[in-house]
Amino acid sequence: MACTGWTSPLPLCVCLLLTCGFAEAGKLLVVPMDGSHWFTMRSVVEKLILRGHEVVVVMPEVSWQLGRSLNCTVKTYSTSYTLEDLDREFKAFAHAQWKAQVRSIYSLLMGSYNDIFDLFFSNCRSLFKDKKLVEYLKESSFDAVFLDPFDNCGLIVAKYFSLPSVVFARGILCHYLEEGAQCPAPLSYVPRILLGFSDAMTFKERVRNHIMHLEEHLLCHRFFKNALEIASEILQTPVTEYDLYSHTSIWLLRTDFVLDYPKPVMPNMIFIGGINCHQGKPLPMEFEAYINASGEHGIVVFSLGSMVSEIPEKKAMAIADALGKIPQTVLWRYTGTRPSNLANNTILVKWLPQNDLLGHPMTRAFITHAGSHGVYESICNGVPMVMMPLFGDQMDNAKRMETKGAGVTLNVLEMTSEDLENALKAVINDKSYKENIMRLSSLHKDRPVEPLDLAVFWVEFVMRHKGAPHLRPAAHDLTWYQYHSLDVIGFLLAVVLTVAFITFKCCAYGYRKCLGKKGRVKKAHKSKTH
């Protein structure tokens, strides 16, 4: 765009700024994951769009939330399943969580309810069957891929088109984060997923931690077998998870050391925990009325996340009984069957503005499944928690918050009505919980750059520089025995043994020489006396 005919310097400056903005704008391919994963990724995508970048989102035509109301190009591809199939498999998965808690990598990866993951894994095969879409992506000359790695498809796309990638994740299942980033994770103080251990493990816990690590190496490849077969088929060469993850330019990790335990990190790992926290907005009149009616006691916010829509009747009644025994008004996000014993102080809603409610000064506690979104909103707003984890990283999140004195954890399958009542009264009446969560909130907010701005910066950085090779450790170029210096240890051990052997031989030779000489002297002396 040419700017002519202006004599005033102000319009000229504006024009130059706009021109610079267009010159810096890039072209970004986004390969997201459905469900709650998309909620936070979307905020980064929207900010990138506002900054003038050309964004193309590739998504399956069957999804729950993907691509809605985005002001960018959205490309869809057909899937081998329907929305009814997706809902059915998801309900089976969610229902299984109320039967037994997943406490081992085996039960997580080998569960009979995991068919939903195979549906997600099949997406990439469907994408690459769409030759028209593949040709469009090939000709588009993207600067980078912004992806959620859960179903592997974004990783496959990045490798297929040889594009630098930015991974957006809370964490990576199994050991693929540490392996893909070549990041050390000492088992002596870095607990594995699902165990619910702190970083101060007992000897017994450290043994269990090592066993879990071995189980990951034995079982994870079976869980991802279908995904890797699809990847190998698309890339036309056998690949492993390491092959897919190891080319990541930047890891945007939705965690923060206010929640997680300190551990080794790599220079291309950027921490954006709390990216889902936003400035509180005015509450809808309906919820403002609930709070005003609660009086001096205030309210308790209760949500088990978007994945839990139904609770077994007996458990729902036990929960309702406990809620009825506290003086606070309880706002319970629940779409299941209304418990028959629901008390007058408990209000069921199909949706609630969770972050805005947690930010209200009359909120006394938060009952949560300890998903990362809810935990960070609780930290940001300084609200103590009663945590009822169900699956995935929720057990670990709950353990971390309990260790830091910011809440109480209950086993949702085994807890009684009395357990929940006591936990609620503890976090509401014991000031230490409020003080601890406020301290964590203060630490979390004391940062030079907001998580959203940090995420946007690093995506743009990869787009500008076509990757971040200067942050890639040389460990990727070493064999496993070179990485652990086994060849050096073997060489030095051989040198030490060789020196020791030569020294021993020399000493033995000298000893024999000395003994031999003494023996001859003694014999000569004896012959003279005779």
From Swiss-Prot:
Q: Could you say which enzyme class this protein belongs to?
A: transferase
Keyword Transport belongs to the record: no
Signal peptide interval:
1-25
EC number assigned by the record: 2.4.1.17
Where are the N6-succinyllysine residues found in this chain?
K99
What this protein catalyses is: glucuronate acceptor + UDP-alpha-D-glucuronate = acceptor beta-D-glucuronoside + UDP + H(+); 2-hydroxy-17beta-estradiol + UDP-alpha-D-glucuronate = 2-hydroxy-17beta-estradiol 3-O-(beta-D-glucuronate) + UDP + H(+); 4-hydroxy-17beta-estradiol + UDP-alpha-D-glucuronate = 17beta-estradiol 4-O-(beta-D-glucuronate) + UDP + H(+); 2-hydroxyestrone + UDP-alpha-D-glucuronate = 2-hydroxyestrone 3-O-(beta-D-glucuronate) + UDP + H(+)
Q: Gene Ontology terms, cellular component aspect?
A: endoplasmic reticulum; endoplasmic reticulum membrane
What residue ranges are annotated as transmembrane?
Answer: 488-504
Any one Gene Ontology BP term: negative regulation of fatty acid metabolic process
A GO molecular function assigned to this protein is: enzyme inhibitor activity
Per the record, the similarity remark reads: Belongs to the UDP-glycosyltransferase family.
| Binding partners and assembly | Homodimer. Homooligomer. Interacts with UGT1A1, UGT1A3, UGT1A4, UGT1A6, UGT1A7, UGT1A8 and UGT1A10 to form heterodimers. Isoform 1 interacts with isoform 2/i2 suggesting that oligomerization is involved in negative regulation of transferase activity by isoform 2. Isoform 1 also interacts with respective i2 isoforms of UGT1A1, UGT1A3, UGT1A4, UGT1A6, UGT1A7, UGT1A8 and UGT1A10.
UniProt miscellaneous comment? UGT1A9 isoform is part of the UGT1A complex locus which displays alternative use of promoters, first exons and terminal exons. The locus is defined by 13 first exons, which are alternatively spliced to 3 other common exons and 2 alternative terminal exons 5. From the 27 possible mRNA isoforms, 9 produce functionally active polypeptides (UGT1A1, 1A3, 1A4, 1A5, 1A6, 1A7, 1A8, 1A9 and 1A10) called isoforms 1 (i1). Use of an alternative exon 5 (5b) as terminal exon is leading to 9 additional alternatively spliced products termed isoforms i2 and which lack transferase activity.
Q: What is this protein called?
A: UDP-glucuronosyltransferase 1A9
Annotated source species: Homo sapiens
Q: What is the lineage of its organism?
A: Eukaryota, Metazoa, Chordata, Craniata, Vertebrata
> What's the gene?
UGT1A9
